[in-house]
Amino acid sequence: MAEQQRRVQVVVVIGGGPLSGRAARAVRDDAFVIAADSGLDQAVAAGMRPSVLVGDLDSISAAGRMWAYAHEAEIDEYPADKDLTDTELALARALRVPDVWQVLLVGGIEDTGERRLDHQLATILALGHPALAAAHHVRAVIGTTELAMVHPGHHVVLELEERQLFSLLALHGPCTGVTVTGARWPLTDASLTGTEARGVSNEAGERTDVSVATGVLTVVIP
């Protein structure tokens, strides 16, 4: 009998604030955890043990650095002047984990009144990188909002309560062949662009499936 393929969940923890309960619950006990800079502080506070620390390390605490050295985490340090964000570097590192099946990004939202919308948008856009299609599932929980990325060749099953809201957004460019089954408002071979809101506020059914033929579709679950 052939050996069953391992399905590794790789979790990327970013900084910004404490992780929500929804984010923490999405992380499996056997997950491989990668921290992006000060994401290590949030990961440790949530009871995780990061195996890798990635970034320019300009925002991680001194205690976080000491934790990484004491626990012999792999440290991939980059110069502050770089073209990629720490989040992008961490996502790229996630794809190098053997048998990666799901990439899950988790992050909190700092309640300081100085939230960086540009950072949040850049993080969501990074999740749609074509290379991430190598993982079968790409998801995120940012604050208390869940995201799922739908790449061509993969479909996403939304495990939601009936009538729970979800939205479809073409944030990464036009999407064609958008098909949604089991929802209140199904779609068949539809096209969505980033300038229309036709996919906002749909309602899940008993089993809701989402797929796309071309483009990268973002499913938002408030």
Predicted regions and their residues:
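N-terminal nucleotide-binding beta1-loop-alpha1 segment
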Residues: 1-18
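Short beta-strand segments
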Residues: 13-15, 37, 106-108, 141-142, ...
